[in-house]
């Protein structure tokens, strides 16, 4: 295409790839070790650029260098969560384990502790938020939200602070999507949504600085999901050293 042709005219080219694990298909072994394997379009594009230009560097970045729990063999430098927290690039993390996370007791303990730690506080003109991950839409709608409404009522917190984002237009409307995208916008309606119930949302790539807590109302087998979901609350928001809280099963 025209863009590719213009890129090929550049005398020197640097390639930067974000979320680089998407360079590989689902079958990592075939993608990397089998010479006859199909290549992904992005890898093909980079290889074509290399053949037609003078690529001086190709940098690939990812927060999850795995495909189906297999570590990518091309990792040359890693800067881990621990180092990022120690050096002040991320919030610190306070994980709290529970025996049974599929219960009203878990939600009650989670919301109560979250509100005790962060309720009424403001960070960079933003209200602190708690994300609650359910396993499926029915569970989010029929179990999590009703229990959450009861808990908030008891704590004298407006139930209008609940936001449901489950990827189903029957329950999540355009206004909800707009509020979800505005969680980090001071003065917006989205900023008033402090309890965000999610299904298959808010994982990889979700950047919400005002997120101070994550609760897994499930015990997923995937370590990658646990990592991607729980680390969402670690984004730094001020120069102050802050701590986010993670509520999950002891197994996770």
Enumerate the language-model features and the residues they cover.
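Extended charged low-complexity segments that act as oligomerization/scaffolding linkers
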Residues: 50-55, 81-89, 93-102, 107-108, ...
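Conserved Walker B
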Residues: 19-21, 202, 219, 233
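Conserved C-terminal RecA-like helicase domain
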Residues: 31, 102, 106-204, 220
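Conserved RecA-like ASCE ATPase "motif II neighborhood" in helicase/translocase motors
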Residues: 1-16, 24-48, 178-186, 198-200
């Amino acid at each position: 295409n025209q863009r590719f042709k213009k890129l090929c005219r550049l005398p020197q080219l640097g390639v930067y790839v974000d979320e680089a694990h998407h360079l590989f298909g689902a079958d990592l072994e075939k993608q990397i070790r089998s010479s006859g394997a199909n290549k992904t379009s992005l890898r093909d594009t980079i290889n074509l650029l290399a053949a037609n230009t003078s690529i001086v560097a190709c940098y690939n970045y990812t927060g999850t260098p795995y495909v189906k729990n297999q570590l990518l063999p091309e990792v040359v430098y890693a800067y881990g969560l621990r180092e990022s927290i120690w050096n002040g690039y991320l919030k610190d993390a306070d994980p709290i384990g529970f025996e049974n996370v599929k219960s009203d007791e878990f939600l009650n303990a989670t919301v109560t502790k979250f509100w005790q730690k962060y309720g009424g506080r403001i960070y960079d003109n933003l209200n602190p938020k708690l994300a609650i991950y359910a396993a499926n839409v029915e569970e989010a709608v029929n179990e999590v939200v009703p229990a959450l409404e009861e808990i908030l009522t008891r704590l004298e917190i407006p139930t209008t602070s609940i936001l449901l984002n489950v990827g189903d237009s029957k329950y999540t409307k355009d206004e909800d999507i707009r509020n979800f995208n505005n969680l980090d916008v001071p003065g917006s309606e989205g900023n008033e949504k402090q309890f965000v119930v999610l299904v298959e949302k808010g994982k990889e790539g979700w950047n919400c600085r005002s997120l101070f807590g994550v609760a897994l109302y499930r015990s997923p087998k995937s370590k990658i999901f646990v990592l991607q979901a729980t680390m969402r609350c670690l984004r730094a928001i001020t120069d102050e050293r802050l701590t986010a809280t993670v509520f999950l099963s002891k197994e996770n």
